[in-house]
Amino acid sequence: QEPLQLFGERIGVAFQLVDDLIDIESTKEESGKVAGTDLLAGVPTLPVLLLSKFEDAESKALYQKITSGLTLEDLPTVLASLREHPVMEQARAETVRWGDQAIEAVMALPAGSVREALVAFANAVVDRKG
């Protein structure tokens, strides 16, 4: 595939994964979004998908609470639990991996301002908070 096509696909995935993290980690002031809207809507996000792989009782209970009809009343507790859970570190690492793969794709382009701008854009996508 062409470097720019690969870049676009990979940075698009990274953008969505960052959005999954923002839904859990950020405040309305930071992102403009109410935290947990994807969770309440039952949207399958990367942290929840990764959480399903954990075998400990606490993780299983958290996953069950999220996937069996999460309520607005339970949301603050669930968000706090997710924010402290190792699954968030795993999800962040996966997001960084996609960003790194996007950067790797544009390394096939000639050195110069275009490549530098794409690398800067990829880094900004992965580092965004809102």
Stretches found by the model and what they are:
Residues 1-130:
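All-alpha prenyltransferase/terpene-synthase fold signal
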